[in-house]
A protein has these predicted regions:
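Hydrophobic pocket/interface hotspot
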Residues: 11, 29, 33, 37, ...
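Generic anion/oxyanion-binding catalytic loop in active/binding sites
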Residues: 18, 50, 103
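Short, solvent-exposed loop/turn segments that connect beta-strands within catalytic domains
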Residues: 23, 47, 101-103
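Short, low-complexity N-terminal intrinsically disordered segments enriched in polar/charged residues
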Residues: 1-35, 142-147
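Generic recognition of cysteine residues
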Residues: 21, 53-56, 95
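A beta-strand edge to alpha-helix "cap/lid" segment located at domain peripheries
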Residues: 2-6, 66-147
Length: 147
């Protein structure tokens, strides 16, 4: 009889795949999430960029990955640690991306906090160096105007 992998093991496997495919295939993340899943980001304000707003449900999460793929090319995405306590899994790592239009490189530590209910992820909150993102995307003036 096989044992069901822990939420931490499932999250780690999804990120390992994400790194190996260099961000071209987000499907393992969809195996984790429920229909009521919400993805949120520390990036603010929400109208700054598609990646900044909350993404609720599979279709909106697909929009997130499409926006990421449209603008950024993954250089690396390394897992440092995955911690599980109760229904919470925290992924800690680093990533480096090149903006497809500006050519700028953004390297940042990254922390993703996952919340699970009944074996399905219901929420993920991502934290990263937002200034590196804004600089890399050439959006400093837009951010200054929004602030």
């Amino acid at each position: 009889m096989s044992e069901t992998p822990s939420n931490a093991a499932r999250v780690r496997a999804a990120y390992e795949h994400w790194e190996q495919c260099r961000g071209s295939d987000p499907e393992p993340f969809f195996a984790l999430i429920g229909e009521d899943f919400t993805m949120a980001s520390v990036l603010d304000p929400p109208d700054l960029h598609e990646l900044a707003c909350d993404h609720c449900g599979h279709d909106r999460v697909r929009d997130y990955f499409a926006a990421l793929d449209a603008d950024w090319t993954m250089i690396d995405f390394t897992t440092e640690q995955v911690i599980e306590q109760g229904d919470t899994v925290v992924w800690i790592g680093n990533c480096t991306w090149r903006h497809r239009h500006t050519g700028s490189v953004a390297a940042t530590p990254k922390v993703d906090i996952w919340t699970f209910r009944d074996g399905r992820a219901v929420r993920m909150f991502e934290m990263f160096d937002t200034l590196a993102f804004v600089r890399g995307a050439g959006m400093l003036q837009q951010l200054a105007a929004a602030g």
